[in-house]
Design a protein with these regions (language model features):
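Bacterial N-terminal signal peptides that target proteins for export
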Residues: 1-11
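Sec/Tat signal peptide C-region and signal peptidase I cleavage site
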Residues: 18-24
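N-terminal (or domain-start) structured segment
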Residues: 25-93
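Bilobed "Venus flytrap"/periplasmic-binding protein-like clamshell domains
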Residues: 31-55, 59-60, 119-186, 279, ...
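Acidic, polar ligand-binding/catalytic clefts
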Residues: 81-117, 200
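Pocket-lining segment of extracytoplasmic ligand-binding domains
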Residues: 88-90, 99-100, 129, 165-257, ...
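Short Pro/Gly-enriched coil loops immediately N-terminal to beta-strands
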Residues: 106, 113-120, 207-208, 248-251
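An extracytoplasmic/periplasmic, membrane-proximal ligand-sensing/linker region
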Residues: 179, 185-186, 196-214, 220, ...
Length: 319
């Protein structure tokens, strides 16, 4: 009897172990590459990871803090993430292998999942700095975003269009949004350029602590960038405390990018569950409210992932 009991127990344990191994083998991971915690990418990435963890069977999903666009795309190419947020111009630079933008080789594994919302070039100066125009930045202390981040690439493009170089500034800091704001609060910086969705937390924080001026980027200056990804736009009045008038600027689209190593089924589910649970994204940040499925494939700088393509065909977005 004891022998049969031991055999039965052994078989049960063996079955449990096999089931456990099978379960572990079935579990898949989605690492969502975002940006700094004070930007828009991070809360959106957290929302996406929550959607995927709940809606896709046997999936564990996390949101990773990064330096945003350029780092995200390089991590995707290396297979160190399944989904990333990036600015359109950074995606184009990565696909071409633009070394000056931080891409030492062509990132040929990148695949598109969806367009999202627009980033707005938001140049904010302290009111007592005397800065009111782009030309006034000359001789001032300015943060241009983390080195080789999407924001910093935008800063280079906008400064060049304005006839400015970093050497024209008294001091250049390569800092994430939150750190830039802290230095401005402490009067160690005069201005910060942040490429983000409207109402970004870092600038809202700054505007409640010190009087600010939102510096305009006129439409003719946007045209001088010479990149169709940059379009004239407006930061509406009262987006930030003390900003009482509309301010002209440039807008650049954001995209969700994956890579060719992600299975067709997983890419299909990532696109599908994002749009079937879009209210979760809308609740994460106001900027996300401009994400619409009908715009999902517009202006995609890289080939669409076959899994995402399957979903968009299924819903009649593409033929």
């Amino acid at each position: 009897m004891r022998l049969f009991h031991k055999i039965g127990l052994g078989l049960s344990l063996g079955a449990a172990l096999v089931a456990g191994v099978a379960s572990a083998q079935q579990q898949q991971f989605i690492n969502v590459l975002t940006g700094g915690q004070s930007g828009v990418y991070y809360p959106m990435g957290v929302a996406l990871s929550q959607i995927y963890g709940k809606a896709i069977p046997n999936v564990r999903s996390t949101a990773q803090v990064t330096k945003a666009s350029a780092e995200n795309l390089n991590l995707l190419q290396a297979g160190r993430g399944e989904l990333a947020m990036s600015l359109a111009d950074a995606v184009s630079d990565a696909w071409r292998g633009n070394a000056e933008a931080g891409f030492n080789t062509k990132l040929d594994k990148l695949r598109g999942l969806s367009a999202t919302y627009n980033n707005y070039i938001q140049i904010v100066a302290s009111a007592d700095s005397g800065i009111k125009t782009m030309a006034d930045l000359k001789g001032k202390r300015v943060s241009v975003g983390a080195a080789k981040s999407g924001t910093e690439l935008n800063a280079r493009a906008i400064f060049k269009a304005a006839g400015l170089a970093y050497t024209d500034l008294a001091k250049v800091e390569y800092l994430p949004f939150g750190e830039s704001v802290e230095l401005m609060k402490n009067r160690q910086l005069d201005a910060t350029l942040q490429s983000a969705g409207l109402g970004v937390a870092s600038i809202r924080d700054l505007a409640t602590a010190v009087k600010i001026v939102v510096v305009p980027v006129p439409a003719d200056m946007v045209a001088k960038v010479g990149d169709p990804a940059y379009q004239p736009a407006v930061i509406p009045a009262n987006t930030y405390t003390g900003q009482t008038a509309d301010v002209a600027t440039a807008a650049i689209p954001n995209f969700l990018i994956t890579h060719s190593g992600v299975s067709d089924e997983m890419a299909y589910q990532m696109a599908k569950q994002m749009y079937e649970n879009i209210d979760t994204l809308y609740a994460a940040h106001n900027a996300a409210k401009s994400i619409k499925r009908e715009n999902a494939v517009k202006g995609m700088p890289v080939p669409l992932h076959p899994g995402a393509e399957r979903y968009y065909k299924e819903v009649g977005l593409i033929k």
